Amino acid sequence: MVVTKPATQRPRLPSVGRLGLVDPQAAERMAQLGWYDHDDQAHVDLLWALSRAPDPDAALLALVRLAETPDAGWDELGAALLTERPLRGRLFAVLGSSLALGDHLVAQPRSWKLLRGNVSLPTHDELCAMFTGCVDEALADPGSAMVRLRTLYRDRLLVLAALDLAATVEDEPVLPFTVVAAHLSDLADAALAAALRVAEHNVCGDRTPPRLAVIAMGKCGARELNYVSDVDVIFVGERADTVTTRVASEMMRLASEAFFQVDAGLRPEGRSGELVRTVESHIAYYQRWAKTWEFQALLKARAAVGDAELGRRYLDALMPMVWVACEREDFVVEVQAMRRRVEQLVPADVRGREIKLGSGGLRDVEFAVQLLQLVHGRSDESLHVASTVDALAALGQGGYIGREDAANLTASYEFLRLLEHRLQLQRLKRTHLLPEADDEEAVRWLARAAHIRPDGRHDAAGVLREELRHQNLRVSQLHAKLFYQPLLESIGPAGLEIRHGMTSEAAERQLAALGYEGPQSALKHMSALVNQSGRRGRVQSVLLPRLLNWMSYAPDPDGGLLAYRRLSEALAGESWYLSTLRDKPAVARRLMHVLGTSAYVPDLLMRAPRVIQDYGDGPSGPRLLETDPAAVARALVASASRYSDPVRAIAGARTLRRRELARVASADLLGMLEVTDVCKALTSVWVAVLQAALDAMIRANLPDDGPQRGKAPAAIAVIGMGRLGGAELGYGSDADVMFVCEPAPGVDDSAAVRWAASVAEQVRTLLGTPSVDPPLDVDANLRPEGRNGPLVRTLASYAAYYEQWAQPWEIQALLRAHAVAGDAELGQRFLLMADKTRYPADGVSPEAVREIRRIKARVDAERLPRGADPNTHTKLGRGGLADIEWTVQLLQLLHAHEVPALHNTSTLECLDAIAEAGLVPADEVDLLRQAWLTATRARNALVLVRGKPTDQLPGPGRQLNAVAVAAGWPTDEGGEFLDNYLRVTRRAKAVVRKVFGS
């Protein structure tokens, strides 16, 4: 029988399981330390203290290693741990947080005594004195100098980390992040000064060393250093001679071996530049060559060690340049490029774990703060501070950001920096990566090291995950608000004002820095939006900071803001509009990109606003892609058929066309559609409009008396020509057509033709009526005899004409002929008739081919518009659309009788057939294909950006950047887009010349 012992006789010592120890050897290690030999209260408290270490197993293992080290004085340490709560908290916390500092303690076992008693952080001067004393002792034995300095540096890190972490184990004071970061910077200064002294000794011996100032940059310069970080420096010498450079180089080597990596990459010309420059050389560089990012870097500059007078001269000379950098001509362009570069630095697979460069991370805060300092620092000296936390406070105090926002952003920034410190302490390695989401053990360790405790709903790891989500989201939201909320408060109604709001001049400076070329107009638009009465103004005030931030990344934020104002005013009565933008960030972000890129789409959206709701994502992907162009075409024809009045029928057709154009153009701008899909969708809707218009006019013109009452005197088919026939229409394309008719039984040809011509002319007139929508021009000039020929012919008339009189250009035009609307059977018969002309059994005559070559030469010489650049005209320029299409058509004329696959109206499909048949080498065909696709994308992009048909690419500037973005290139890469266009078309032109034999 088992007898339960009374409670007073049960062991008081907690088991390893209750302590949270999971290492299989934990119990053995406890016994090795003798901690299970006594069950008094002191040992109970000791064990529970160990359990509170961030990683108690790691702490226990380090203690065992320390106990096994002869010089550690374990008996003294073991006894002290039982009675000295502060020592216990510091030692357990640091051993449970940092494997590297545990290794240091084992290597320097007596260093635990640094954590004993009333420990405080030394001042900057006291640290410098410690390192100076160490150097004085070490120089007597130069071989050991850096070893001693390295040990001293690690000892001081140990003390700081222990004080920083102690509160996780015992009730010890919490060190503020700013104190930790400043002390790390002081420690770096002392270490650099020591390395400089040793370097001077190594290089100069007993000679007087050269005057050299070391300027700390980055986080060290701002006194906000990490536990593990490169220390960025710039060297300033009285003379930039060999000896001074050797001292600087030796200092970098010694410091990098003993303390931390020293990086001089921020110096003028970077790693390609001289390591040491004089003050005068620095001044000359920054006056002539420095980029905006280099002035931004100077915000953190601080004379750290070395010659103080030289350092002061350097700062006095260069800092005034920092505060006028925002007036530089290329400031805005470079700032926008820097913003985008920050976002592109992070590999996609770790973006969610990046605490520094990820979305809502540290760099978001730092970049935004530095930009606001550059913009407003010229007129406000209170912003001339180096650290991020101090700058946030100054920006809030000055009204450049809301004070509550400044406080929230500071809290988020300090939280993220705390996590960064804990991650780096673990192995004293430079890292910014959070643990993998499914690495429960690593997440739990980080939470405990950051002094995060369970909250009743989540364990520590769960609380950390929630807090990270909250802080990242808050930073992302405040990042946008940071730039724009104070602007709105400076122009908004009384209820939005802050006590010391931004002046209008400051608001204009800030908008200009964010990419707005007309900041005064932008402020007027913003004012009109937020000063609306009632709910709309309030919602706009909430929405605009985020919307304006997204829009600032578009190529034309000025045009985008105007379009947004017009759209908002046009949809003022639509309650869903602002709600959608508020509740669906993906919709709002995509809309801002479209509005800030295109002049074509905003007008369409004002009359087809429901397309905006399709900017979001559905279960299967983007909702803009859920619509089938063929279904749209059927719906358009059906909608028009419900009206007996042709005008109303076409109005109904225009409505559906407008919506489809808005959908296709939006999806195109957002990178969701390939250019070939765009062309097919545009062709589909054009064909549907032609069908609807033809049906409406036939209904309106049916005879109301006589034997043909209620019956059409003729069947009519519409033959698509050019890009319409090839299903390759762009946004600015006309519809090239021919009309063919066939008399109804009992109707003579002349009457049938007159009636069909009247219908065709009415179709052209009705569709061509000026409208707010993109034009619907129907061009019939490719018919036999061109403008001089009859608008409509019978099938027999066409056959007779082509058999007897067809000119080479008319044969060439027929290569693109395709039945698109009207009587399908008649259309097919027309194509069979046309095949005899365009694909004759024995091939086209040599005379016709020579004539085509002659016409092409004349087109090249004469048809380019006056003043056009032949290198960048997308239609008629070198290697443009006409070049590629004429080349394909010449090969069709020469070989279609031998290669049935060339009986095709599509340029791209014919190119595939040409390559398959070996008529042109495959690599050359690919050059033609790439040129056609490139020119088509560019031509479509021109219409999307400018809002009207045009073929000429603009020169370098904002509009070219917009065209590049609309064509699928990243923002600010207009130059690369143009270079690519020129390269692709130049190579294609060589193939064109080869085929044409010129």
Curated annotation (Swiss-Prot):
Taxonomic source organism: Mycobacterium avium (strain 104)
Family designation: Belongs to the GlnE family.
Keyword Magnesium: yes
Gene Ontology, cellular component aspect: cytosol
Reactions catalysed, as given in the entry: [glutamine synthetase]-O(4)-(5'-adenylyl)-L-tyrosine + phosphate = [glutamine synthetase]-L-tyrosine + ADP; [glutamine synthetase]-L-tyrosine + ATP = [glutamine synthetase]-O(4)-(5'-adenylyl)-L-tyrosine + diphosphate
Residue numbers spanned by region Adenylyl removase: 1-487
Gene3D superfamilies: Beta Polymerase, domain 2, Nucleotidyltransferases domain 2
Cofactor(s) for this UniProt protein: Mg(2+)
Keywords: ATP-binding, Magnesium, Multifunctional enzyme, Nucleotide-binding, Nucleotidyltransferase, Transferase
HAMAP family: GlnE
Region (Adenylyl transferase): 492-998
GO molecular function: [glutamate-ammonia-ligase] adenylyltransferase activity; [glutamine synthetase]-adenylyl-L-tyrosine phosphorylase activity; ATP binding; magnesium ion binding
A GO BP entry: regulation of glutamine family amino acid metabolic process
CDD domains per record: NT_GlnE_GlnD_like
EC number(s) given by UniProt: 2.7.7.89, 2.7.7.42
Purpose of the protein: Involved in the regulation of glutamine synthetase GlnA, a key enzyme in the process to assimilate ammonia. When cellular nitrogen levels are high, the C-terminal adenylyl transferase (AT) inactivates GlnA by covalent transfer of an adenylyl group from ATP to specific tyrosine residue of GlnA, thus reducing its activity. Conversely, when nitrogen levels are low, the N-terminal adenylyl removase (AR) activates GlnA by removing the adenylyl group by phosphorolysis, increasing its activity.
Protein name per Swiss-Prot or TrEMBL: Bifunctional glutamine synthetase adenylyltransferase/adenylyl-removing enzyme
